[in-house]
């Protein structure tokens, strides 16, 4: 059963930036820490004169799949939506 939850809430992210690539390690949302095990997809959406990069992330320990967005202008992260893996 598909139970998508749209939230559009800010999150704190620990990521590794290298060679124009962003590797998300984990993020904090509502005082919970979510370890990112895998990134399934990445795409960019124009936003003003810059763009936002969106990621589909799998958090196996939390049984969650989610969409995260990174705004390259203000360097802020947002949790767009999430769902359970099962």
What role is predicted for each listed range?
Residues 1-86:
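N- and C-terminal low-complexity/disordered segments
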């Amino acid at each position: 059963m598909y139970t998508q939850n749209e939230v559009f809430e800010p999150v704190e992210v620990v990521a590794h930036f290298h060679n124009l690539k962003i590797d998300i390690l984990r993020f904090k949302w509502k005082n919970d820490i979510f370890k990112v095990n895998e990134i399934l997809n990445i795409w960019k959406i124009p936003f003003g004169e810059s763009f936002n990069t969106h990621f589909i992330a799998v958090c196996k320990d939390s049984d969650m799949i989610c969409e995260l967005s990174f705004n390259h202008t203000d360097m802020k992260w947002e949790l767009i939506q999430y769902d359970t893996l099962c």
